[in-house]
Curated annotation (Swiss-Prot):
Belongs to the GADD45 family. InterPro entries: GADD45, Ribosomal_eL30-like_sf, Ribosomal_eL8/eL30/eS12/Gad45. It holds the Pfam family Ribosomal_L7Ae. It comes from Bos taurus (Bovine). Two central helices mediate homodimerization through parallel packing. Coiled coil: none annotated. This is Growth arrest and DNA damage-inducible protein GADD45 gamma. SUPFAM superfamilies: L30e-like. Signal peptide: none annotated. GO terms for cellular component: cytoplasm; nucleus. The keyword Transport does not apply. Keywords: Apoptosis, Developmental protein, Differentiation.
Length: 159
């Protein structure tokens, strides 16, 4: 048995628990951000916020289903948003289930118009630092992922 195999055996349960914890934390963060009114949904809306006030953005979620993987325009937008977030020290994750995300944050805005959930930004509600335990857990998760060169980790949302 090699060292890699031994390490692989130890990290599988740990990484599964870590992933589940991150998914639960993301679920809590999305609900909290939505209640406080500091959630921006949509690729174009998010790009506007990132352009105008990137220092106020604390977290970014990119979401795409399997059928979205073939959408070249969406993938280009994702690449640009990822680069911008990395450049501005904004934690970023990917979610592979847009339907589950829609169940958490809803599918329409105040007027009932459908919302693009491919990109979600979470901003500070005011100048004071927003202390949310779920945000802190996710920041730690992202930091740990970056330490193993996983710059945009995938998170599975809980059922």
């Amino acid at each position: 048995m090699t060292l890699e195999e031994l390490r692989g055996q130890d990290t599988v349960p740990e990484s599964t628990a870590r992933m589940q914890g991150a998914g639960k934390a993301l679920h809590e963060l999305l609900l909290s951000a939505q209640r406080q009114g500091c959630l921006t949904a949509g690729v174009y809306e998010s790009a506007k916020v990132l352009n105008v006030d990137p220092d106020n953005v604390t977290f970014c979620v990119l979401a795409a289903d399997e059928e979205d993987e073939g959408d070249i325009a969406l993938q280009i937008h994702f690449t640009l948003i990822q680069a911008f977030c990395c450049e501005n020290d904004i934690d970023i994750v990917r979610v592979g289930d847009v339907q589950r995300l829609a169940a958490i944050v809803g599918t329409g805005d105040e007027s009932g118009a459908p919302v693009d959930l491919h990109c979600i930004l979470i901003s500070n509600p005011n100048e004071d630092a927003w202390k949310d335990p779920a945000l802190e857990k996710l920041s730690l998760f992202c930091e740990e992922s970056r330490s193993v060169n996983d710059w945009v980790p995938n998170i599975t949302l809980p059922e």
